[in-house]
Amino acid sequence: MSAELIAVYKDEQIIDLESAKVLGLSDGIKALKGTEPIYFDDSPLALEVIRHSCAHLLAQSLKALYPDAKFFVGPVVEEGFYYDFKTTSKISEEDLPKIEAKMKEFAKSKLAITKETLTREQALERFKGDELKHAVMSKISGDIFGVYQQGEFEDLCKGPHLPNTRFLNHFKLTKLAGAYLGGDENNEMLIRIYGIAFATKEGLKDYLFQIEEAKKRDHRKLGVELGLFSFDDEIGAGLPLWLPKGARLRKRIEDLLSQALLLRGYEPVKGPEILKSDVWKISGHYDNYKENMYFTTIDEQEYGIKPMNCVGHIKVYQSALHSYRDLPLRFYEYGVVHRHEKSGVLHGLLRVREFTQDDAHIFCSFEQIQSEVSAILDFTHKIMQAFGFSYEMELSTRPAKSIGDDKVWEKATNALKEALKEHRIDYKIDEGGGAFYGPKIDIKITDALKRKWQCGTIQVDMNLPERFKLAFTNEYNHAEQPVMIHRAILGSFERFIAILSEHFGGNFPFFVAPTQIALIPINEEHHVFALKLKEALKKCDIFVEVLDKNDSLNKKVRLAEKQKIPMILVLGNEEVETEILSIRDREKQAQYKMPLKEFLNMVESKMQEVSF
């Protein structure tokens, strides 16, 4: 069955076997020219078809178990699929095994999955009395609708789908949640059930293993266990508190970045947290981003708390006159920004309302775009290499709605392409995915569990310089508008540290570990030596803790291991008398001895091994 054709890919669309019949192709799908065949396997395109059909299998099973159930939408998403529905019955996660069993029953029944097309009038009549399906239709333009049937179940859908439920053997329902109708919190709350499906048993098994591993590595769990950060309801949702160990980890990353930024010609700047709404109107944020901003009134004037740092950096640029000899100007700031996120999407440090960006803005001439982007790509590689991340790039080009001349866009896009080519970086192209004011490169990193995360962005901006009438004097003594490059490599420290925590499972590499060395004196008489060693290590810029509670040696060692501290030094009579240290090295997975001076030299060298 793995070799069976289930669909084809043509013109960025998946066309299933039933859709080919509806199109009136006498030879079915094989009559379509210029197509890429999609076979029943665990490839991305095949999984889209499989998971879409599994969503319908879920809905069919829900209808059988809860006859009054009504369904909204059941799309394929990054984590599998889901279906939003409502019923008068109370459903909890404890019901998922029962629902899953019914799905398996329908799958074994080998029900044919067929398609018909209806006019809008016919579809409204077919789903008469179903307000959720009417809500779906109200959001769809056009007057032709697809309806897929399997057994006694049918659903409004454009596809694609498998030809038969017999294909669906390897799936799992993963969780139950609430979801507002259409994502609007003013609407009624529906039930959402998530699931995952694969073509093969191995695909499902590997995925479920990854899910269990992800639970162990969940940064919210690690944040508590390792004392990195916390949240407090009295302070507010989405507003993290950095605890001492988390702040140490963050500061280490900030310091390494600052050193690299200064060496690369960036100047530190700092803008205010709140700015008059007048500037947000000039920038366009007031009209296009207002619902994500927080506002306050001071002396009868409206101010907006900044959701981005770009306007402040523009004002720094405008504080002086510039000639072409000054360019490029590179400003950076660890800028604290606030964005209103709905409470339902907040997620640990990954999605918060206050966060700090490793933000920079480069003001340059058009001719300097390629060299500046090339330097950013080099910088990005150094950072990702230091943390052991693999990454990929995606170039987003001009959208249908945009500003600027065609030649200017082409020149800017080609500059990004040439910079990527210069670094021999394979990249994907998102045609039409750029911002209305310029092309961009997105940086996506892959973690230890092979999950992809959107982090940094390199964005060429031809809009804000025009809105704020930025200028520099060119070599012909004429005023010329600079290009502005928005650049964040980590994205935000909060998000990056969340990803870093899950990537390493809390076992941070030595150079950024919140506690790098634990000193464990065996008895009280060894405490003085431990404090002396602590001071020596602090001079080497090492984060060190002395575990001197009145506990057994084994308990103190277990505590240090539980805290995932890279190096543990047990200090007893022999170590005090000989100054030869006993070291437990997590990274080397070894225990060894080393003279004190040699050890201090070693850790000092380890701290100098990593730079961006």
Swiss-Prot record:
It catalyses: tRNA(Thr) + L-threonine + ATP = L-threonyl-tRNA(Thr) + AMP + diphosphate + H(+). It is an enzyme of class 6 (ligase). Residues 218-509 are annotated as: Catalytic. Keywords: Aminoacyl-tRNA synthetase, ATP-binding, Cytoplasm, Ligase, Metal-binding, Nucleotide-binding, Protein biosynthesis, RNA-binding, tRNA-binding, Zinc. Its main location: cytoplasm. Transmembrane segments: none annotated. SMART domains: tRNA_SAD. InterPro entries: aa-tRNA-synt_IIb, aa-tRNA-synth_II, aa-tRNA-synth_II/BPL/LPL, Anticodon-bd, Anticodon-bd_dom_sf, Thr-tRNA-ligase_IIa, Thr/Ala-tRNA-synth_IIc_edit, ThrRS_anticodon. It comes from the Bacteria. The keyword Zinc applies. Its cofactor is Zn(2+). Catalyzes the attachment of threonine to tRNA(Thr) in a two-step reaction: L-threonine is first activated by ATP to form Thr-AMP and then transferred to the acceptor end of tRNA(Thr). Also edits incorrectly charged L-seryl-tRNA(Thr). Homodimer. Belongs to the class-II aminoacyl-tRNA synthetase family. This is Threonine--tRNA ligase.
